[in-house]
C-alpha cells in the first residue's frame, strides 16, 4: 500500500459520504457511498477480496471523499457523481434498453402518440409497455374510441382519419377546449384505471343503437368491444387493486448481482427488466444505488407504489423517490416480491452455468486442435503477425492464448530493428529470435504451439530460428488466408502440409479468433507507430523544438490532427516561445 494512501486512511471521518477511487492517471475509476466513510474505504485496503475486487483495488492509486449530512444525501450524490464521471467499474445500467410509452401531448389540440423518450414537456406519459406492438395495439384501440387529432401539423383540409371517425378535424372545424379536455380525461382514466367502465358505456351505446334499429352503428360498437377485450385481456391479473407498481427482487453470488424489476400496470404484470452486473460494496448498498439510478438516471416513470424485499431500507428509498414504498409480509404482493427474488437467483445461476459451459467448450476446442494436429494439447498458444506499409515503420506483434482464451497481460509489441524494406521473412526471424532468446534467458515457460499469420515462407523462417538456431522443438503452424482475406487453411510440419479442419468446427473457430486478434493487435500498433513517426517528422524542421518539447506536444495533443486545430495561444499556454509557436503554427497549416 502506498504511503500517502496509508496516511489518508488514518484521517478518514466516521460520517456518511461518497468516495472516489482514482488510477495512476488521476481518472476516477469507481464511485461509492458509505454510512461510515472510515469503515467502508478502509475495507478496500484490508483483508482478502475476490479476484474482481482485487483487480479494482490493484488499480487504485489515490482516493478522495466527500462528507454528506445524511445517508440519503450520500445516495443522491453518488448517483450524480456516477452520471458525471461514468467510472469504468460502476457498470450498473449500462444498457440502452428503453420501453415504449403512450403519451398525451401538451398541445392546444392534443395527440396520442407512442414514444420511447420521456421528456419534461408537460405531456402525460403512460406505461411502460412490454414492446412496441402492445403500445401500438392499445393506441389503435384508443384511436377508435376517442377522435383526437392525428396529424403532427394541422393540414389545410380534412384527412382520412376524419372520414373514418377517428379525428374531429380541428384543421377545418372548431373543436372546443372542453371537448379536448373530456377526451384527455377519459383516455387518462382508461389507461390508469382500466377499461371496465368504458366497456359498460360502450355496451349501453350498442344496446341503444340496436333499439333504435341503427344496426350498422351497433355492429361497429360490438366490433370495438371485441377488439377491446382482445387487447386488454392478454395479461393475467396479478393484484386486484389496479395500482401501478414496480416490484424489485435481487440475488448476488461470486461478486455478481442480478436485479429484476417487474412492471405491474392496472394489476397486470406486463414486463420485467433484468440487469446483471459486478458489485464491489455490500450487496444491500449496491441494491439501493441501483434503485436510485433506475429512476433518476434511466428516466423510468415512478409508479404509485414500489415493493421491495425484506432487509431493504424502505424509508430511505421512499425519501429518495417520493413514492409509496412497502416491504410486503404476506399475500399477493409478497408473492410478487418472492417471484422477482426467485427469478433473480435463477438468472444468476444461468449466467454462471453459461460461463462454465463456454469455458468447457473452449478447453474442448484446444484439445481437439491438438488431436487434429497430432501434438500434445496446446494449452498455451503464442501467435505472431507483422505489419508495415511498403517497408515503412515495420512492426510485429504477439498475442498469447491460455486455455483457449486471450491473456492480454502476455501480449507483446516489437519494432523491427534489423530489417530494411518490406521483408516479411526477415522480420519474422528477428521477432521470433528476440522473443524466445529472452524466454530462455529468463527461464520462463515456453508455448505449446506457435501460430504464424502467414504461409509456408513465414513458417519456414520461424522454424529456422527455433529449430536450427535455438534448438527448440515447439510446433509451428501457419494460417493461410483466401482471396477474401479470411482464414482458409491450417499449415503444419516441415515442409508445411495442410491439416484438414472443418470450417464449422470449434477448433477452426479458435484459430480464426487467434488470427483476427493478432492481426488487430499488430495493425493497431502499426497505426500508433506511424502516427507517432509522422508527428515527430512534422516537428523536426521547427527550430526551437527539441526532444523534450516533442514529448510535451505529443502528450498534450496526441496527434497531428489535434495540433493542426490548435491556435498559437494554445502553444503559448505550454510555455513555448512566441516565435517558435508562430513557426510551428504556420508549418502545420501547410501540411
Curated annotation (Swiss-Prot):
InterPro entries: GIY-YIG_endonuc, GIY-YIG_endonuc_sf, GIY-YIG_UvrC_Cho, RuvA_2-like, UVR_dom, UVR_dom_sf, UvrABC_protein_C, UvrC. The keyword Ribosomal protein does not apply. Transmembrane segments: none annotated. Keywords: Cytoplasm, DNA damage, DNA excision, DNA repair, Excision nuclease, SOS response. Residues 196-231 form the UVR domain. It is found in: Cytoplasm. One of its GO terms (biological process) is nucleotide-excision repair. GO terms for molecular function: DNA binding; excinuclease ABC activity. Residues 14-91 form the GIY-YIG domain. SUPFAM superfamilies: C-terminal UvrC-binding domain of UvrB (SSF46600), GIY-YIG endonuclease (SSF82771), RuvA domain 2-like (SSF47781). One of its GO terms (cellular component) is cytoplasm. Belongs to the UvrC family. Interacts with UvrB in an incision complex. This is UvrABC system protein C. The lineage of its organism: Bacteria, Bacillati, Bacillota, Bacilli, Bacillales. The gene is uvrC.
Amino acid at each position: 500500500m502506498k504511503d500517502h494512501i496509508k496516511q489518508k486512511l488514518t484521517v478518514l471521518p466516521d460520517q456518511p459520504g461518497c468516495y472516489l477511487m482514482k488510477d495512476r492517471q488521476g481518472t476516477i475509476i469507481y464511485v461509492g457511498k458509505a454510512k461510515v466513510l472510515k469503515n467502508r474505504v478502509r475495507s478496500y485496503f484490508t483483508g482478502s477480496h475476490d479476484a474482481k475486487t482485487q483487480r479494482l483495488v490493484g488499480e487504485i492509486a489515490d482516493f478522495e471523499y466527500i462528507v454528506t449530512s445524511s445517508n440519503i444525501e450520500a445516495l443522491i450524490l453518488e448517483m450524480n457523481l456516477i452520471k458525471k464521471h461514468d467510472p469504468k467499474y460502476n457498470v450498473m445500467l449500462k444498457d440502452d434498453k428503453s420501453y415504449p410509452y403512450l403519451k398525451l401531448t401538451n398541445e392546444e389540440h392534443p395527440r396520442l402518440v407512442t414514444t420511447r423518450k420521456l421528456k419534461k414537456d408537460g405531456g402525460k406519459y403512460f406505461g411502460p409497455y412490454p414492446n412496441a406492438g402492445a403500445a401500438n395495439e392499445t393506441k389503435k384501440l384508443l384511436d377508435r374510441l376517442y377522435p383526437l387529432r392525428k396529424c403532427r401539423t394541422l393540414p389545410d383540409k380534412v384527412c382520412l382519419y376524419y372520414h373514418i371517425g377517428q379525428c374531429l378535424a380541428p384543421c377545418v372545424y372548431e373543436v372546443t377546449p372542453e371537448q379536448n379536455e373530456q377526451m384527455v380525461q377519459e383516455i387518462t382514466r382508461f389507461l390508469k384505471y382500466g377499461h371496465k367502465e368504458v366497456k359498460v358505456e360502450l355496451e349501453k351505446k350498442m344496446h341503444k343503437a340496436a333499439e333504435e334499429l341503427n344496426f350498422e352503428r351497433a355492429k361497429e360498437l360490438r366490433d370495438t368491444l371485441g377488439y377491446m377485450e382482445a387487447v386488454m385481456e392478454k395479461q393475467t391479473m396479478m393484484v386486484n387493486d389496479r395500482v401501478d407498481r414496480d416490484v424489485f427482487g435481487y440475488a448476488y453470488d461470486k461478486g455478481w448481482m442480478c436485479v429484476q424489476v417487474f412492471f405491474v400496470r392496472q394489476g397486470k404484470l406486463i414486463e420485467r427488466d433484468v440487469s446483471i452486473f459486478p458489485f464491489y460494496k455490500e450487496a444491500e448498498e449496491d441494491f439501493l444505488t441501483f434503485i436510485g439510478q433506475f429512476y433518476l438516471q434511466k428516466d423510468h416513470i415512478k409508479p404509485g407504489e414500489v415493493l421491495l424485499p425484506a432487509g431493504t431500507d424502505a424509508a430511505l428509498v421512499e425519501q429518495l423517490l417520493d413514492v409509496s414504498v412497502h416491504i410486503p409480509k404476506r399475500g399477493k404482493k409478497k408473492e410478487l416480491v418472492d417471484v422477482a427474488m426467485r427469478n433473480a437467483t435463477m438468472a444468476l445461476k444461468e449466467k454462471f452455468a453459461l460461463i462454465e459451459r463456454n469455458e468447457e467448450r473452449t478447453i474442448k476446442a484446444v484439445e481437439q486442435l491438438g488431436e487434429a494436429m497430432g501434438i500434445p494439447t496446446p494449452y498455451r498458444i503464442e501467435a505472431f503477425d507483422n505489419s508495415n506499409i511498403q517497408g515503412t515503420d515495420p512492426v510485429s506483434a504477439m498475442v498469447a492464448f491460455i486455455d483457449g482464451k486471450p491473456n492480454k497481460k502476455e501480449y507483446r509489441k516489437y519494432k523491427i530493428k534489423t530489417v530494411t524494406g518490406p521483408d516479411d521473412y526477415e522480420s519474422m526471424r528477428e521477432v521470433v529470435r528476440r522473443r524466445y532468446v529472452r524466454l530462455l534467458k529468463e527461464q520462463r515457460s515456453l508455448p505449446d504451439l506457435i501460430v504464424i499469420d502467414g504461409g509456408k515462407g513465414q513458417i519456414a523462417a520461424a522454424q529456422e530460428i527455433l529449430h536450427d538456431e535455438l534448438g527448440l522443438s515447439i510446433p509451428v503452424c501457419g494460417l493461410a488466408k483466401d482471396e477474401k482475406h479470411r482464414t482458409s487453411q491450417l499449415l503444419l510440419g516441415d515442409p508445411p502440409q495442410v491439416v484438414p479442419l472443418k470450417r464449422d468446427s470449434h477448433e477452426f473457430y479458435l484459430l480464426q479468433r487467434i488470427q483476427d486478434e493478432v492481426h488487430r493487435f499488430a495493425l493497431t500498433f502499426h497505426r500508433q507507430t506511424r502516427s507517432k513517426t509522422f508527428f515527430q517528422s512534422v516537428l523536426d524542421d521547427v527550430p526551437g523544438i527539441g526532444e523534450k518539447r516533442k514529448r510535451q506536444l505529443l502528450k498534450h495533443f496526441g496527434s497531428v490532427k489535434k495540433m493542426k486545430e490548435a491556435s498559437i495561444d494554445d502553444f503559448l499556454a505550454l510555455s513555448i516561445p512566441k516565435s517558435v509557436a508562430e513557426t510551428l503554427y504556420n508549418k502545420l497549416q501547410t501540411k
